[in-house]
Curated annotation (Swiss-Prot):
Start and end residues of each stretch annotated as Transactivation domain: 499-608
Modified residues (Dimethylated arginine): R550
Protein's name according to its UniProt entry: Histone-arginine methyltransferase CARM1
Start and end residues of each stretch annotated as Interaction with C9orf72: 27-138
Protein's gene: CARM1
Regulation acting on activity, per entry: Methylation of H3R17 (H3R17me) by CARM1 is stimulated by preacetylation of H3 'Lys-18' (H3K18ac) H3 'Lys-23' (H3K23ac) by EP300 and blocked by citrullination of H3 'Arg-17' (H3R17ci) by PADI4.
Domain SAM-dependent MTase PRMT-type per the UniProt entry, residue ranges: 146-453
Entry PTM: Auto-methylated on Arg-550. Methylation enhances transcription coactivator activity. Methylation is required for its role in the regulation of pre-mRNA alternative splicing.
Record EC number: 2.1.1.319
Subcellular location: Nucleus; Cytoplasm; Chromosome
PROSITE patterns: SAM_MT_PRMT
Catalysed reaction equations from the record: L-arginyl-[protein] + 2 S-adenosyl-L-methionine = N(omega),N(omega)-dimethyl-L-arginyl-[protein] + 2 S-adenosyl-L-homocysteine + 2 H(+)
GO terms, molecular function: beta-catenin binding; DNA-binding transcription factor binding; histone arginine N-methyltransferase activity; histone H3R17 methyltransferase activity; histone H3R2 methyltransferase activity; histone methyltransferase activity; protein methyltransferase activity; protein-arginine N-methyltransferase activity
Length: 608
C-alpha cells in the first residue's frame, strides 16, 4: 500500500508553481497568478474598503513554522506583504478566498480558481503546524510511528516493490478499466497515491479530474510522473494527509490501496473512510468491500520453530551466565509475533469464516475495536496450533465486480497470509466445533493488538494468546510450501517409477545400476497422487493454475458461519516468489527485491 498521509513540499494544484526560496534551507516559493486583493478596515467607526483593480501575482514563501505572503503588480511592485504563523488571525472565506487580520485592518485575498486556493491553503496549514488544531490522524498516531511510516513509503524502491506485485497492480487496473463508466468524465480522489499509479489508471478510464493525495515525499515524484506523462490538466497531486488537506470540490469515486496485513494493519483504512467527507452521496469506492478470512490450522513444524528459538534462553551457562530465568519471557515474545508467510492449504482444519467491512457504510470508529466471533466445524482430527488469516477485497462497479484475493489458493501477493499461534495447542476431532473470539484493538503505532480466545466445545479445553501485529515474524523463504505430513494416500516412490516412460538424468550424476542421465521434470510436473476426496473442500487443494481465468475474476473464498462461498479450480503452476529479509520493520505490506522476483508466465490470461 502507499502512504495516505505527511506533508512535504509546496502545493501542486491549479496554476501554482514552486521554485526554491531563500528564507531558509527548507523554504520554497509557490506562485499563484491572477489573485485579487481587498483591504477592509473600520477606522473611526466606519467600514472602509480598498480593492486593487488589477490582478496580482501572489507568492508564498514556505518555512518550517510560518509562511511569507507577498502580492506583486504586473510592474513587480509589492503591494502587500506579511508573515503568517500559528498566532496570526486568518481564515478561509468561501471556496477560493482567504482573509488575514493585521491590527485594525483585514485583507481578503481571492484566488483565480478553487484549485489555486486549495493548494495555497494546504501549504499554509503545513507551515503553521497542526498543534493547535490536531487532525484525526495526529490524534490516533504517535509522532515517531508516523515519521517512520512516511519515510518508509517515500522510497522509490518501496513503491517499486508494491508496483511489481503483478496481482495487486494488474487487478486494480483491470477493475478500473473494466468499469470505465464509473470513471468517464468523473471527479476522482486517490487516497495515498504513492507514485500515482492508480491515478494514471483512472485517467486511462477517462476521468476528467483526479486529486491525488500523498503525504510522504513520494508526492514530489508523483508530480514528476504527472508532468512527464502530460496529464497536469487532469491529475492534481496534493501533498499532505487526507485528514488535513482541502479539496476544491466533491468527488464521484474514491480509489485507494489501503490494505495492510490481515487487511487492517497500518490503519490506513481509517484514512480511506475519512476521505468519504469529499464523496458525493451517490459516489462509489474502489475497493468497495473487504473480507477478512480466518481458519484453524495445524503446523507442528512452525510451532516447534518458535519454541526452539526461545530455548536459547534456557541455557544454564551461556559464557558462564545462567539465562534460564528469561526463557518464559522469550516464549511469550516469540508467540506474540504473527507469522507472515504462505502455506499449503491442506494444513487448514475447517472452512474459513469471514468478517466483512463495507467501506461505503463503515465509519472510522468501527475500526477502533474489531470483534470477530467464530465457530468452526472441524473437518479433521489433530492439534490446532492457531488461526490463519487472509483477506479479499471487491471492486463493485457498474459493469462488473472484480476481486483481489490474498487466499492461500491464489497466486502469492506481497501481503502473503498471516498466522497467529497458540502457546498451548488444542486437540480437536473431526466433527467437533471450535468456537471463540478474535478481538483487534487499534493502537497509536498504526497497528492492532490482537486477542484470541478459542475452545473445543465438546471437551471444554481452551487456549488463548495476545499478539502484536506491529511486530510480525517474516518467515517466507521463496520456496513452495511443503504439504503437511500424511498428505500422501498412495506411494510417491511407486508413482515416480510407474509413469511408464524412460527418464534422462540431465544432472549427469552416476549411480550404480541407474542411467547416467535422468530427467525428472515429468515426475515433478505430475505431482503426488493425493486423494482430493480426503482433503478440505475449501477451493483448490493444489497449487493453482490460472490459465483458465482472468486476473481479478475470482470470487471471495470462505464461508459465513457455515455457508460455503468458495470457488475452486485445479491444475499446477509456479507462483510468484517475494523474498523477505530483515528490512521489514514496518509491519506493513512490503516485499524485498533483494533477489529478482519470479513472475509466473501463466497468471494473467484474458480469456473467459
Amino acid at each position: 500500500m502507499a502512504a495516505a498521509a505527511a506533508a512535504v513540499g509546496p502545493g501542486a494544484g491549479g496554476a501554482g508553481s514552486a521554485v526554491p526560496g531563500g528564507a531558509g534551507p527548507c523554504a520554497t516559493v509557490s506562485v499563484f497568478p491572477g489573485a485579487r486583493l481587498l483591504t477592509i478596515g473600520d477606522a473611526n467607526g466606519e467600514i472602509q474598503r480598498h480593492a486593487e483593480q488589477q490582478a496580482l501575482r501572489l507568492e508564498v514563501r514556505a518555512g518550517p513554522d510560518s509562511a511569507g505572503i507577498a502580492l506583486y503588480s504586473h510592474e513587480d511592485v509589492c503591494v502587500f506583504k506579511c508573515s503568517v504563523s500559528r498566532e496570526t488571525e486568518c481564515s478561509r472565506v468561501g471556496k477560493q478566498s482567504f482573509i488575514i487580520t493585521l491590527g485594525c485592518n483585514s485583507v481578503l485575498i481571492q484566488f483565480a480558481t478553487p484549485n489555486d486556493f486549495c493548494s495555497f491553503y494546504n501549504i499554509l496549514k503545513t507551515c503553521r503546524g497542526h498543534t493547535l488544531e490536531r487532525s484525526v490522524f495526529s490524534e490516533r498516531t504517535e509522532e515517531s510511528s508516523a515519521v517512520q511510516y512516511f519515510q518508509f513509503y517515500g522510497y522509490l524502491s518501496q513503491q517499486q516493490n508494491m508496483m511489481q506485485d503483478y496481482v495487486r497492480t494488474g487487478t486494480y487496473q483491470r477493475a478500473i478499466l473494466q468499469n470505465h463508466t464509473d470513471f468517464k468524465d468523473k471527479i476522482v480522489l486517490d487516497v495515498g497515491c504513492g507514485s500515482g499509479i492508480l491515478s494514471f489508471f483512472a485517467a486511462q478510464a477517462g476521468a476528467r479530474k483526479i486529486y491525488a493525495v500523498e503525504a510522504s515525499t513520494m508526492a514530489q515524484h508523483a508530480e514528476v510522473l504527472v508532468k512527464s506523462n502530460n496529464l497536469t490538466d487532469r491529475i492534481v497531486v496534493i501533498p499532505g494527509k487526507v485528514e488535513e488537506v482541502s479539496l476544491p470540490e466533491q468527488v464521484d469515486i474514491i480509489i485507494s490501496e489501503p490494505m495492510g496485513y490481515m487487511l487492517f494493519n497500518e490503519r490506513m483504512l481509517e484514512s480511506y473512510l475519512h476521505a468519504k467527507k469529499y464523496l458525493k452521496p451517490s459516489g462509489n469506492m474502489f475497493p468497495t468491500i473487504g473480507d477478512v478470512h480466518l481458519a484453524p490450522f495445524t503446523d507442528e513444524q512452525l510451532y516447534m520453530e518458535q519454541f526452539t528459538k526461545a530455548n536459547f534462553w534456557y541455557q544454564p551457562s551461556f559464557h558462564g551466565v545462567d539465562l534460564s530465568a528469561l526463557r518464559g519471557a522469550a516464549v511469550d515474545e516469540y508467540f506474540r509475533q504473527p507469522v507472515v508467510d504462505t502455506f499449503d492449504i491442506r494444513i487448514l482444519m475447517a472452512k474459513s469464516v469471514k468478517y466483512t467491512v463495507n467501506f461505503l457504510e463503515a465509519k472510522e470508529g468501527d475500526l477502533h475495536r474489531i470483534e470477530i466471533p467464530f465457530k468452526f466445524h472441524m473437518l479433521h482430527s489433530g492439534l490446532v496450533h492457531g488461526l490463519a488469516f487472509w483477506f479479499d477485497v471487491a471492486f463493485i462497479g457498474s459493469i462488473m465486480t472484480v476481486w483481489l484475493s490474498t487466499a492461500p489458493t491464489e497466486p502469492l501477493t506481497h501481503w502473503y497470509q498471516v498466522r497467529c499461534l497458540f502457546q498451548s495447542p488444542l486437540f480437536a476431532k473431526a466433527g467437533d466445533t471450535l468456537s471463540g473470539t478474535c478481538l483487534l484493538i487499534a493502537n497509536k503505532r498504526q497497528s492492532y493488538d490482537i486477542s484470541i480466545v478459542a475452545q473445543v466445545d465438546q471437551t471444554g479445553s481452551k487456549s488463548s494468546n495476545l499478539l502484536d501485529l506491529k511486530n510480525p515474524f517474516f518467515r517466507y523463504t521463496g520456496t513452495t510450501p511443503s504439504p503437511p505430513p500424511g498428505s500422501h494416500y498412495t506411494s510417491p516412490s511407486e508413482n515416480m517409477w510407474n509413469t511408464g516412460s524412460t527418464y534422462n538424468l540431465s544432472s549427469g550424476m552416476a549411480v550404480a545400476g541407474m542411467p547416467t542421465a535422468y530427467d525428472l521434470s515429468s515426475v515433478i510436473a505430475s505431482g503426488s497422487s493425493v486423494g482430493h476426496n480426503n482433503l478440505i473442500p475449501l477451493a483448490n487443494t493444489g497449487i493453482v493454475n490460472h490459465t483458465h481465468s482472468r486476473m481479478g475474476s475470482i470470487m471471495s473464498t470462505g464461508i459465513v458461519q457455515g455457508s460455503s462461498g468458495a470457488q475452486g479450480s485445479g491444475g499446477g503452476s509456479t507462483s510468484a516468489h517475494y523474498a523477505v529479509n530483515s528490512q521489514f520493520t514496518m509491519g506493513g505490506p512490503a516485499i524485498s527485491m533483494a533477489s529478482p522476483m519470479s513472475i509466473p508466465t501463466n497468471t494473467m490470461h484474458y480469456g473467459s
